[in-house]
């Protein structure tokens, strides 16, 4: 089977939080992976010479996200998107439990390999949307 090469990789890894059990933890909702297992995924084999990676991460996982970017053969550039979460049923802000502060935002990091071209100057960084 031949696998294509992609110009864009859009990833929302199943991060495993190593800081202990927390109510609402990802492990309670879906299978997660260790950072070592995520780094071992053969993502580099799927990328074109010029490729952009959009990688969703939470602030507690930022060091792991930067490690993952490097392991997959990319170079960190910036924060592409910031998701500001609203509650599902009313127009108030959603707040998670957090480790130090009550978290709201998630970030999507942008990393590149080669020299991918910017597609539009009209893309904004903020995404304001309810949680699913």
Predicted regions: what they are:
Residues 1-132:
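Class I S-adenosyl-L-methionine-dependent methyltransferase catalytic core
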